[in-house]
Amino acid sequence: MVTKVKCPTCQTELEWGPQSPFRPFCSKRCQLIDLGEWADEEKRIPGEIDPELLPYPEEGEQWQ
């Protein structure tokens, strides 16, 4: 049985398998549209930011 999924960008139905090199996207175009949305911060993973993971000190703090 062939698994079919919808492209998260344009909702086109496609088969999930080696014949779909851009999966879960239907094309390179849809893949790049999604990447651009992440780069523009239109998409993000919800949650609090751990201050210990920040590369720079917050304003007013000193480097250790």
Swiss-Prot record:
Any one Gene Ontology BP term: regulation of DNA-templated transcription
Pfam families in the record: YacG
Cofactor(s) in the UniProt record: Zn(2+)
Record flagged with keyword Zinc: yes
Cofactor binding note from Swiss-Prot or TrEMBL: Binds 1 zinc ion.
Region: Disordered, residue numbers: 44-64
Residues that coordinate or bind Zn(2+): 7, 10, 26, 30
Keyword flag Zinc: yes
Keywords: Metal-binding, Zinc
Annotated InterPro entries: DNA_gyrase_inhibitor_YacG (IPR005584), Znf_NHR/GATA (IPR013088)
A GO molecular-function annotation: zinc ion binding
Subunit-level organization: Interacts with GyrB.
PANTHER family: DNA GYRASE INHIBITOR YACG
Function: Inhibits all the catalytic activities of DNA gyrase by preventing its interaction with DNA. Acts by binding directly to the C-terminal domain of GyrB, which probably disrupts DNA binding by the gyrase.
Sequence similarity: Belongs to the DNA gyrase inhibitor YacG family.
Protein name: DNA gyrase inhibitor YacG
The species this protein was found in: Aeromonas hydrophila subsp. hydrophila (strain ATCC 7966 / DSM 30187 / BCRC 13018 / CCUG 14551 / JCM 1027 / KCTC 2358 / NCIMB 9240 / NCTC 8049)
Gene name, Swiss-Prot/TrEMBL: yacG
